[in-house]
Curated annotation (Swiss-Prot):
Residues 322-400 form a coiled coil. Keywords: Cell projection, Coiled coil, Cytoplasm, Cytoskeleton, Metal-binding, Phosphoprotein, Repeat, Zinc, Zinc-finger. Residues 67-98, 623-643 are annotated as: Disordered. Microtubule-associated protein that is involved in the formation of parallel microtubule bundles linked by cross-bridges in the proximal axon. Required for the uniform orientation and maintenance of the parallel microtubule fascicles, which are important for efficient cargo delivery and trafficking in axons. Thereby also required for proper axon specification, the establishment of neuronal polarity and proper neuronal migration. It comes from Homo sapiens. Residues 429-528 form the Fibronectin type-III domain. This is Tripartite motif-containing protein 46.
Length: 759
């Protein structure tokens, strides 16, 4: 039983030693100088907070051409008279200056930089290339002498050396051979002692007896950091400059207005932050290990993906090479065929010319024919020969090679192809799309339209994201609703909530991945469900003056010759013609909304709603040409009715004329404005691109809105004792276009070869 416990204890001890050894090896990376790749020796803290050995820093500055700027840092005493080993016992350490001495020093000009002459206008700025961050850091005029030694890092390096060294005992430096193992060290004397030597060299009753013993070490450091400018102990920390300062630095003009705190406060704050961060890291070791596993998996995936990408690129380039090789063979074949054809023609021409030589070919045959004495036989043979001789003579007189020897027509212009091959590069993700705000709107549904910027890589499909902004925010990241793999450059979002604000964005995707999101666009949905209706011209509309479109969603008033002839027969001073068009749907409950666009060039148009029965009574029997004594309107927006009548009017119209909305004086009595920022009664406001009408049947109210921004223009009471329908009145020329519901738009088709294809 005891042997088992001993074995378990031994195993636990060995595991602990292995863990300590592993942690020490891992920590060793933090203790290596980035220049010499060895343990730090007298490390200096650069302005970029990285560390470098003092000797390495001097060497780097020497390579950069800075000579004489590699002085020792202030924390290491350099004067032989002031070094701890040679300092007189009668001399005590310098104490902090008193406030009155500080004033005298400042008045005498002590605040100038050491080593810098007064009046120097262009001091040399020393730049040091940091080997850790690969950046140039400014050391100031004093070079390395203006840097602090990292004493904490030195102590960590020393503890690390002692922990990993086995049998490396530190020997006494003052013993006679053989020296004993050192048990104490003295920072002032900069030496290690055994017990006997320490007592011998620190006799009782002398100044050296006051030296504080330390653990034995091979590298001695000063007890504290000293100001590089004033050789005083640092007592404060400048948060603005992020630098330790002494009492003299604190009152200098350089730190005027800076946030300066005592070293104790900075020490406690930084220690608390570091402890808190370290505690968090140590408490989440499982998370760290999980993330390490994820990173290792990412490394493996990167290796596999990189190899696949290499193979794909190689395959594509080989494909390009195969196409080029095939094209090369085809072009060479064409040149070869052209060359053989020309050679054949030139060879035939050479043979013809050789036959013209004396005694050979055609000439020899002709000479023999001329020897014939039989006239009929000569004529028979010479007839055909003469034709050949004539052609040969003509060819001789107009000599020209039968084929050109030049192949200029076979030259290739590969400038465009070379440019394409030079610009051949990896596919980039699409750039952020640009939302077309002129074509994007919200009506019965939300229609979103966008386009890619010029010179953007193509997108195979898009992702549309949207969410409501007027709902309480849920804890955690913002949740978006997505529409994946949208083809084309537009999207339709069905059944949006009424009276809400939606924010939408879109991004493209191709084989390279997803691109950046577009800028967010905010859309207001209508305050009520959209009412679908058409224009009804069966009554109250003059076919001579009103033209209704085939789809019954647009109407135009065109005053013509009948109006002029009718006006000429009347003796009144002013003649007006009122034409009315109603919607074919009446509202009997709930809330409804619709929108329309009024032509800005319209003379006078009234857009609104009214009781269907009252509209028929008022307008169906009205004469075509009327005088001012006959008013077809209810008078609610002209102020003609008695203001004391509390009954709601049967009509509610918004008057538009010549690109302006006319808010009559009577509007203030019968119509309530929708807000304190709304228009004032008795004025005009610009006509928006679209007008919206919202009818609340139960409340008996109708609101007129800017259908683009949904800003309220006017709110009026309305008698809703019966069916209420939309109405449009025209006086003079004008036009109205109903906004077509998005859901009823037919899909645009493109006919190709007798087949209909959806666009």
């Amino acid at each position: 039983m005891a042997e088992g416990e001993d074995m378990q204890t031994f195993t636990s001890i060995m595991d602990a030693l292995v863990r300590i050894s592993t942690s020490m090896k891992n920590m060793e990376k933090e203790l290596l100088c980035p220049v010499c790749q060895e343990m730090y020796k007298q490390p200096l803290v650069l302005p970029c907070t990285h560390n470098v050995c003092q000797a390495c820093a001097r060497e780097v500055l020497g390579q950069q051409g800075y000579i004489g700027h590699g002085g020792d840092p202030s924390s290491e005493p350099t004067s032989p008279a002031s070094t701890p080993s040679t300092r007189s016992p009668r001399l005590s350490r310098r104490t902090l200056p008193k406030p009155d001495r500080l004033d005298r020093l400042l008045k005498s000009g002590f605040g100038t930089y050491p080593g810098r002459k007064r009046g120097a206008l262009h001091p040399q700025v020393i730049m040091f290339p940091c080997p850790a961050c690969q950046g140039d850091v400014e050391l100031g005029e004093r070079g390395l002498a203006g840097l602090f030694r990292n004493l904490t890092l030195e102590r960590v390096v020393e503890r690390y050396r002692q922990s990993v060294s086995v049998g490396g005992a530190i020997l006494c430096q003052l013993c006679k051979p053989p020296p004993l193992e050192a048990t104490k060290g003295c920072t002032e004397c900069r030496a290690t002692f055994c017990n006997e030597c320490f007592k011998l060299f620190h006799p009782w009753g002398t100044q050296k007896a006051q030296h504080e013993p330390t653990l034995p070490t091979l590298s001695f450091r000063p007890k504290g950091l000293m100001c590089p400018d004033h050789k005083e102990e640092v007592t404060h920390y400048c948060k603005t400059c992020q630098r330790l300062v002494c009492q003299l630095c604190r009152v200098r003009r350089t730190h005027s207005g800076h946030k300066i705190t005592p070293v104790l406060s900075a020490y406690q704050a930084l220690k608390d932050k570091l402890t808190k961060s370290l505690t968090y890291i140590l408490g989440n070791q499982d998370t760290v290990q999980t993330q390490i596993c994820e990173l290792e998996e990412a490394v493996r995936h990167t290796e596999v993906s990189g190899q696949q990408a290499k193979e794909e690129v190689s395959q594509l380039v080989r494909g390009l090479g195969a196409v080029l090789e095939e094209k090369r063979a085809s072009l060479l074949q064409a040149i070869e065929e052209c060359q053989q054809e020309r050679l054949a023609r030139l060879s035939a021409q050479i043979q013809e010319h050789r036959s013209l030589l004396d005694g050979s070919g055609l000439v020899g045959y002709a000479q023999e024919v001329l020897k014939e004495t039989d006239q009929p036989c000569f004529v028979q043979a010479a007839k055909q020969l003469h034709n050949r001789i004539a052609r040969a003579t003509e060819a001789l007189q107009t000599f020209r090679p039968a084929a050109s020897s030049s192949f200029r027509h076979c030259q290739l212009d590969v400038g465009r192809e070379m440019k394409l091959l030079t610009e051949l590069n990896f596919l980039r993700v699409p750039e952020a799309p640009v939302i077309d705000t002129q074509r994007t709107f919200a009506y019965d549904q939300i229609f979103l339209c966008w386009r890619l910027p010029p010179h953007s890589p193509p997108a195979w499909h898009y992702t549309v994201e949207f969410r409501r902004t007027d709902v309480p925010a849920q804890p955690g990241p913002t949740r978006w609703q997505r529409r994946e793999e949208v083809r084309g450059t537009s999207a339709l979002l069905e059944n949006p909530d009424t009276g809400s604000v939606y924010v939408l964005r879109v991004r493209g995707c191709n084989k390279a991945g997803y691109g950046e999101y577009s800028e967010d666009v905010h859309l207001h949905t209508p305050p009520a469900p959209v009412l679908h209706f058409f224009l009804d011209s069966r009554w109250g509309a003059s076919r001579e003056r009103l033209a209704i479109s085939k789809d019954q969603r647009a109407v135009r008033s065109v005053p013509g010759l009948p109006l002029l002839l009718a006006a000429d027969r009347l003796l009144t001073g002013c003649h007006l013609s009122v034409d009315v068009v109603l919607g074919d749907v009446a509202v009997t409950q709930g809330r409804s909304y619709w929108a329309c666009a009024v032509d800005p060039a319209s003379y006078l148009v009234k857009v609104g709603v009214g009781l269907e029965s009252k509209l028929q009574e008022s307008f169906q029997g009205a004469p075509d040409v009327i005088s001012p004594r006959y008013d077809p309107d209810s008078g609610h927006d002209s102020g003609a009715e008695d203001a004391t009548v509390e009954a709601s009017p049967p009509f509610a119209f918004l008057t538009i004329g010549m690109g302006k909305i006319l808010l009559g004086s009577g509007a203030s009595s019968n119509a309530g404005l929708t807000g304190r920022d709304g228009p004032t009664a008795g004025c005009t406001v610009p006509l928006p691109p679209r007008l919206g009408i919202c009818l609340d049947y139960e409340r008996g109210r109708v609101s007129f809105l800017d259908a683009v921004s949904f800003r309220g223009l006017l709110e009026c009471p309305l008698d809703c004792s019966g069916p209420v329908c939309p109405a449009f009145c025209f006086i003079g020329g004008g036009a109205v276009q109903l906004q077509e519901p998005v859901g009823t738009k037919p899909e645009r088709k493109v006919t190709i070869g007798g087949f209909a294809k959806l666009d």
